[in-house]
């Protein structure tokens, strides 16, 4: 119960004369309405009628407006909430002189590598494909009677290891290895000495018979005048680009070999000379085979082209125009070029991934069709 008696004014708010404006009416004896209309916000504030939440939001708005009027800072760095500079991730890092020099050296090495090996003429090819002391597994699927007392050509022979093994183990009448890289041809010729048996008389880097048959290595690039089926007198290496410059030159090609090998080179021919060069290569091989001869190819898959196409702008341009894919080779070689059949030897294993490729053997008919389209117009 309150201690004040009924009707007492103790503790109640008192209103004095100067609290309200003078005047008034019957409906507004204290004249409150006129004060509110003249300055409603000020009157509400004086009477304590303002909404505190509204007042706070207005204050925040005023503060925000004041901040927005501050001049913008012309700084290249973004600032975090603690007002400290923060690195822009889009700006390239500043390299030291040593780092710039190392980057330039790497760039030069890459350019040198791409220019030197644009034909797939890698000088460590067999080191990647084979384990030390291991024989080439592709020899296991070849038949000796394909080569024995026959004439063979190995296109893209590299350092000559496979060519030398065929010359020594399969006894061809002659086998010639050709490569576009002169350095590799020099290495292949030197390797002849290492494949000779101990009883073979060796003079310098080559068998003694080479001086009579071939002359000085530096003086000769052409094949020797005569061959013997006995190794090492049945083998020679020479620098040559097998892809002719034009289709018209195909008319001059004559049958010369019983076996032509084109192992792991189709990708490089395709990238360097495009679809026209690839077709011209196959037509020359067909024309250079005797009736009943064999073309042995080891085509690379088309999905392996993309990586090597980046080696130069020319290779990249040729790659973008390729329509004659490796999966189209078989039908075109049989139906258009004139091969009689194809024997698939399967996939041969290798030390490194990517070298496990199928080997196909195309057979030229004993009696080629005389009504076939001339080679220069296929």
Swiss-Prot record:
Disordered: annotated segments: 1-110
Family annotation (CDD domains): AdoMet_MTases (cd02440)
Biased composition (Basic and acidic residues): 42-72, 85-110
Annotated ranges, domain Bin3-type SAM: 136-367
Catalytic class of the enzyme: transferase
GO terms for MF: O-methyltransferase activity; RNA methyltransferase activity; snRNA binding
Function recorded in the entry: Probable RNA methyltransferase.
Family: Belongs to the methyltransferase superfamily.
Organism: Caenorhabditis elegans
Name of the protein this chain belongs to: Probable RNA methyltransferase Y17G7B.18
Record Gene3D superfamilies: Vaccinia Virus protein VP39
Keywords for the protein's UniProt record, in alphabetical order: Methyltransferase, S-adenosyl-L-methionine, Transferase
PANTHER family according to UniProt: 7SK SNRNA METHYLPHOSPHATE CAPPING ENZYME, BICOID-INTERACTING PROTEIN RELATED
Listed EC numbers: 2.1.1.-
